[in-house]
Regions:
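Rieske [2Fe-2S] iron-sulfur-binding domain
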Residues: 76-183, 187-194
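C-terminal catalytic domain of Rieske-type non-heme iron oxygenases
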Residues: 2-14, 171, 176-404
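N-terminal short leaders/motifs
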Residues: 24-53, 121-134, 164-172, 241-275
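Solvent-exposed, flexible loop/coil residues
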Residues: 49, 53-54, 60, 74-75, ...
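Short Pro/Gly-enriched beta-strand edge/turn motifs at strand-loop
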Residues: 65-77, 149-153, 293-297
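Short linear motifs in intrinsically disordered
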Residues: 71-79, 159, 286-291, 328
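N-terminal pre-ligand scaffold of iron-sulfur
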Residues: 2-121, 170-172
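Short hydrophobic core segments
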Residues: 59, 109-110, 132, 225, ...
Length: 404
C-alpha cells in the first residue's frame, strides 16, 4: 500500500503545496531565462497522422476499444444504485455502483432482445436501484444480475445466470473509473497510471463532486483538438484576450510519467518573483494540466482564494474528422455552498467558450486545410511543444504505426 491510496492518512494540501513550490522554482527559472522546457528538436508529422482513415481505424480499435479509457470519476456514482451512461468510445455502456460499493461496467443492452436499458446518452446519470428494460421489463440489479423476468415460464430451460448483463472490464483507482469498452483483460489501473499515481493522488479526485457537464465538438481529428491542451505556445496569439492576459506564452514546465504527463503554465505573477529570494516567496497553491493516456486532460486550478475546481476533458473521435469532447467541472472537495457552485459553473462556462470558439475553431480550420494539402505535406511540432510530441509518439507506439 502506498501514499497514492486515498485511505492512507496524508496531508494532501501540504503535499500539493510542496508540489507547487517545486514547480514554482522551475517556472521562475524559466521565466528568468525567457525559455521553456524543450524536446531534443522539432518533430515533423506527415499529414496522414491526422487524416488517414486506416490510422483512425487503428486508433479506434486499439485505443478507444482496447485501452483503459476514463469513463468518469468516483463522484459521478457516489452511492449504491447510482449509474451513468458512457457511450463516447463507441459501445453504449452503463457504469453502476453496486450495494457492495464496487463500480462495474455493462453493455447498455438487455439480454432478452438487445434493447437499450437506459435510452439517454452520455453525460446522463441517474439513481436506479433496479434497471428495467423499457421493451419487456426485464429487470437487473446494479451488479448486472437478472432479477425480474415477466412470463418467466415462457423461458423455461433458459439458464437465468447466462442472461445477466454483459460485463466490460472496469477498475476504480484514485477516484478515476476506467473501462475497457471493447472487453478483454481485466484492468490493472495502478499499472496503467504507473508513476503518475502520486501526482494524481494529491488531487484527491475521489472527493470531487460533479457540478456541470456538457459536450463540445470540433470538425477535426481528435488528436488535432487534443494537441492544444499540451502547449502554451499559442497563448499570446490565439488567447490574446483570455489566458494570454494572465499567463506567459511559450513557457512551460513538463513532467513525463510513462505515457502520461503534467504541464505547468506560469502566470505573470511568477515573473514578480525573479528578483525575490525564495524564502520570501508567498505560499503557492497547486495547479496544473494532467494528461492521462490516451485522451483525457484533467486540469486542477482555482476560481478564488481557497476555491478550487477540477476540469476533465475527455476527447473522442466520432469520425476521422469529427471530435466530441465530454467536458465536466467538479468541486474538488465537495460543493459546499451555492456561491461556490456558481463559481465552478462560471469556470465551466468561461472555459467552454474559449475552447469551443478558439481552440476548436483553429483545429477545425487546420484539419480542413490538411485534407487539401500536398501529399508530402508535414506539420511540424516544435521543440517548445515538448508534451505534444510525447502524446503523438505514445499513440503511434500503441497502435503500431510510425509517425512518418
Amino acid at each position: 500500500m502506498s501514499e497514492s491510496d486515498p485511505q492512507i492518512k496524508v496531508d494532501w494540501q501540504a503535499r500539493r503545496r510542496k508540489m507547487a513550490r517545486a514547480g514554482l522554482k522551475r517556472m521562475v527559472s524559466l521565466v528568468e531565462r525567457r525559455d521553456t522546457e524543450r524536446a531534443d528538436g522539432p518533430l515533423p508529422l506527415h499529414k496522414g497522422v491526422y487524416i488517414d482513415p486506416a490510422r483512425f481505424e487503428a486508433e479506434r480499435t486499439k485505443l478507444f476499444l482496447g485501452e483503459p479509457i476514463l469513463a468518469g470519476l468516483s463522484g459521478d456514482i457516489p452511492n449504491p444504485g447510482d449509474l451513468f451512461v458512457f457511450d463516447a468510445a463507441g459501445p453504449s455502456i452503463i457504469v453502476t455502483r453496486g450495494k457492495d460499493g464496487a463500480a462495474r461496467a455493462f453493455l447498455n443492452m438487455c439480454t432478452h432482445r438487445g434493447a437499450k436499458l437506459v435510452e439517454e446518452s452520455e453525460p446522463f446519470s441517474d439513481h436506479r436501484a433496479r434497471i428495467t428494460c423499457p421493451f419487456h421489463a426485464w429487470t437487473f440489479d446494479p451488479a448486472g444480475k437478472l432479477i425480474g423476468q415477466p412470463s418467466k415460464a415462457s423461458f423455461a430451460g433458459c439458464e437465468i445466470g447466462a442472461r445477466n448483463l454483459i460485463e466490460r472490464p472496469c477498475a476504480e483507482y484514485l477516484g478515476l473509473i476506467f473501462v475497457r469498452p471493447g472487453g478483454g483483460d481485466p484492468i490493472d489501473a495502478a499499472a496503467h497510471i504507473g508513476d503518475f499515481s502520486d501526482v494524481l493522488a494529491a488531487l484527491e479526485l475521489h472527493r470531487a463532486e460533479p457540478v456541470k457537464k456538457g459536450i463540445m465538438t470540433a470538425d477535426s481529428n481528435w488528436k488535432f483538438a487534443l494537441d492544444t491542451y499540451a502547449e502554451g505556445y499559442h497563448f499570446a496569439s490565439l488567447h490574446a484576450s483570455t489566458i494570454g492576459q494572465t499567463n506567459y506564452s511559450d513557457v512551460s514546465a513538463v513532467d513525463r510519467y510513462g505515457r502520461h504527463h503534467r504541464v505547468g503554465f506560469p502566470d505573470f505573477g511568477v515573473g514578480d518573483l525573479v528578483s525575490v529570494a525564495e524564502n520570501e516567496w508567498p505560499e503557492t497553491e497547486y495547479g496544473g494540466v494532467h494528461y492521462i493516456f490516451p485522451n483525457t486532460v484533467v486540469f486542477f486550478g482555482s476560481v478564488g482564494v481557497d476555491s478550487f475546481f477540477t476540469q476533465v476533458f475527455r476527447l473522442f473521435p466520432d469520425g476521422v474528422g469529427k471530435t466530441r469532447c465530454q467536458f465536466a467541472v467538479y468541486a474538488p472537495f465537495g460543493v459546499g455552498t451555492d456561491e461556490y457552485k456558481a463559481m465552478c459553473e462560471m469556470a465551466y462556462d468561461a472555459t467552454a467558450q474559449v475552447v469551443q470558439t478558439e481552440d476548436y475553431r483553429v483545429a477545425s480550420h487546420g484539419y480542413a486545410n490538411l485534407l487539401t494539402a500536398p501529399d508530402d505535406y508535414h506539420v511540424v511540432i516544435g521543440s517548445n511543444e515538448n508534451a505534444v510530441q510525447a502524446v503523438h509518439q505514445h499513440i503511434a507506439e500503441a497502435i503500431g504505426m510510425p509517425l512518418n
